[in-house]
Structure formats: structure tokens, C-alpha cells
Amino acid sequence: MTDESLMQAISSGDKRAFDEVYERYAAALLRYFMRMLWRDREKSEDFVHDLFAKIVRKPEYFDTSRSFKTWVYSVANNMCKNEYKKQEVRKGMSNGLDNHYSLYDKNTNVMNEVQDNFFQEAFQKSLVDLDDKHREAFSLRHLEGLSIKEIAEVLEINEGTVKSRLFYATKYLAESLKEFNPVENR
């Protein structure tokens, strides 16, 4: 059954259809929220719950002229934007990183794992350092696998702007991570 057909079934009160949509999207949306909300797992889980609660309460909000995947990521993106406004993102951004770094396993003594962790931390920090619009575009493209067209729909911008944001984000990340070469370090 397509996602769009499942949404029609949800509108009719079909619990199994909701379970199927949840099964298809919950994990991916959790990963998306984790990246967009400073790796705050509790907040990300709350956002996934809230998003699916909206789907159950108001399935008629689904825009049938769009694909479900594009629509659900638009909703998720808007939830993140609202959170950014509440949190004064620029001032609070380091808190999520501090929590992330505190989880680092200091007892690890396998060199490859240590190097991979350093790279992942540097990548996460660089991703967080990107401004919101470039981070959103990069995350949707490279971490969530959306097409340029789908990203344009989610962010409500034209495809040329998406390409520009992706170019800038990639250039910034490449420059900030140039000291790492994970292929050689394996």
C-alpha cells in the first residue's frame, strides 16, 4: 500500500494503517530530529511522538497534491524551525554538543574506533556550525536521501536555491574537515 493510500485509511480510522506509517517513518524521523535538534534524544523522541499525534488527530492536513514523504518532512522541518525560534539557537547550540561529547567512551582503546569518533564529532560540530538553512538542506539531501525537488518542496524554495545551499554546505564541510581522511585511517 502506498503512503498516500495509508493516509486515506488513517482518515477513516484504520489503526493498522497508522501502525504501518509509523513503522515506515518513525526511525528515519527520529534520526532527522536528532540531527536537527542538537542530538537531544529525549526532545527528538518527543517530536516524533508529537508529529505522529498530529497525523492521527488531523489526517486531513495531509496535502494530497504532494507525496507523503515530502509532506511529513515539511511538517518535521517546520517543527524544528519553531523549536529554533523558542531556543535562540545560536546561544544554545553548544549544549547539545557538550552532551554528545560527554557520552564519548573514554575507555575505548581501539585506534580505528577512536579516529572514527574524532571524525564523527568533528563532522557533527561542523554540521551544527552551519547556519540553519544550509544544515537543513544538507541533512535532507545527504542524511535523509531526499531529492533536490523534494527538498525544494519541503523548504518551500526553488531548486536552484537548494543546489546553492548544498554547494555552500558541502564546501564548508569539506574545508572544516580537510584534516581528516577516514579512508587512510582504517
Specify the residue positions occupied by each region the protein language model found.
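Residues within helix-turn-helix
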Residues: K149, G160
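A short pre-motif secondary-structure segment
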Residues: A137-R141
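Internal acidic/polar
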Residues: N82, R90-E113, S147
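C-terminal flanking helix
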Residues: A26, L30, F52, D131, ...
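Short, charged helix-capping/linker segments at alpha-helix termini
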Residues: S11-E20, L30-D50, E159, V183-R186
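C-terminal edge and immediately downstream basic/flexible tail or linker adjoining helix-turn-helix-like DNA-binding
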Residues: S5, A9, R39, G92-S94, ...
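Structural recognition of an alpha-helix C-terminal capping motif at a helix-to-coil junction
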Residues: D46-A53, R66-N78
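Arg/Lys-rich amphipathic alpha helix in sigma70-family domain 2
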Residues: E60-T64, S74-N95, Y168
